[in-house]
Design a protein with these regions (language model features):
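Active-site mouth loops of central-metabolism enzymes
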Residues: 91-108, 131-136, 156-160, 180-181, ...
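Catalytic alpha/beta core domains of metabolic enzymes, predominantly
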Residues: 81, 191, 196-295
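Alpha-helix-loop-beta-strand connector modules within alpha/beta enzyme cores
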Residues: 135-159, 192-199, 248-263, 308-331
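Glycine-rich, proline-tolerant flexible connector loops at the mouths of alpha/beta enzymes
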Residues: 122-140, 297-309
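Hydrophobic faces of well-ordered beta-strands that scaffold small-molecule active sites
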Residues: 92-97, 119-123, 157-160, 175-179, ...
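Non-catalytic terminal accessory/regulatory regions of metabolic enzymes
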Residues: 1-93
Length: 344
């Protein structure tokens, strides 16, 4: 059962609902949103008198297994990263090198991606690599470099966290925590990120269904963190021509099933620099709320994923195209009701 409370609901109403759940030995999870509203997910049904208190605005008895992530009880969520809003109607571009290579190199990249149109800086301080011999990142030193780049450019920072024990330290430096595809079902990490005050970027696993992806988000939400952004980053397929297959079907479907913002990673999703721009535009056309793109001043010299990394000039071109597609879609939404003879 999902119970939605209005922003002005009395504190006593929440207490009554939780007490009713406890009396029936039902587990209840409360998720508070920045606007003051709240959602309570209960593992069972409550009696009618527990749901008639002031401020109860909606009750759902039938719902998806991902109670808190489900769209049924809430409109589009907007997640704030620094001063940037994801899901607020304007596509957001996160960009930067795959891995932090050094302070000066990162600041150069940060300045370049900001000039190109990015509003959030990405960069890995801790890198999960397929080979144990590959560069694993600079660790806390890399986090310090990211914080320095934020100070210089004003861009908020998103970076990956690999283990539950790293969450607090990474949260000290970063504005947003990223949970990568390999860790999508690392449940201790999901729970720990759910207890953080930082927003979380949750990438879809290589072989995960959309429902499994949303259930992973539910782990974070169930711990009290409402600020989750989903990221489609490509799934495994049979064609060796691509590193992964970017599953753009998942974008409108995830937005249909969930209120959480959805962004797309066309860099990992294709593995090919030449396809990043085209798939970025396609992602926005499919309804994505933003993009996360690997960009480097000199991709050929990048320490990680150079073959899928673009230049700042290419990023600027992508940002222009993304804006054009967004404007076209907004115009289409305005004229569609008129063409159909409906009231606007």
């Amino acid at each position: 059962m999902i119970i939605t409370l209005a922003a002005d609901a009395p504190v006593s109403t929440l207490g009554h609902v939780l007490a009713a759940a406890a009396s029936l030995r039902l587990e209840a999870r409360t998720l508070r949103y920045p606007d003051g509203s709240a959602v309570i997910g209960v593992d069972g049904a409550l009696p009618g008198d527990a749901l008639t208190h002031p401020g109860v605005v909606n009750v759902l008895s039938k719902h998806k297994p991902y109670m808190l992530a489900a769209r049924a009880h809430r409109g589009n969520s907007v997640v704030r990263v620094g001063e940037v809003e994801i899901g607020g109607g304007t596509p957001v571009v996160m960009a930067g090198p795959c891995v932090v290579e050094g302070r000066d190199e990162l600041i150069e990249a940060a300045r370049a991606v900001k000039a190109a149109g990015a509003t959030i800086l990405r960069g890995g301080a801790y890198k999960p690599r397929t080979s144990p011999y590959a560069f694993q990142g600079l660790g806390e030193l890399g986090l310090q470099h990211l914080a320095d780049a934020r100070t210089v450019t004003g861009l908020p920072v998103v970076t990956e966290v690999l283990e539950p024990e790293q969450v607090d330290m990474v949260a000290e430096y970063a504005d947003m925590l990223q949970i990568g595809a390999r860790n999508m079902q690392n449940y201790p990490l999901l729970r720990r990120a759910g207890k953080s005050s930082r927003p979380v970027l949750l990438k879809r696993g290589f072989s995960a269904t959309v429902e499994e992806w949303l259930m992973a988000a539910e782990y974070i939400l169930s711990q009290g963190n409402p600020n989750v952004v989903l990221c489609e980053r490509g799934i495994r397929a049979f064609d060796p021509a691509f590193r992964f297959n970017l599953d753009l079907n998942a974008v409108p479907l995830a937005k249909e099933l969930s209120h959480l913002p959805v962004i797309v990673d066309p860099s990992h999703g294709t593995g090919l620099r030449s396809l990043v721009g085209k798939m970025s535009v396609a992602a926005i056309a499919a309804g994505a709320d933003g993009l996360i793109i690997e960009a480097h001043p000199n991709p050929e010299r990048a320490k990680c994923d150079g073959q899928q990394t673009i230049t700042p000039a290419d990023l600027a071109a992508i940002c222009r195209r993304v804006d054009a597609v967004h404007q076209a879609l907004a115009y289409e939404e305005q004229i569609a009701p008129v063409e159909l003879g409906l009231a606007v």
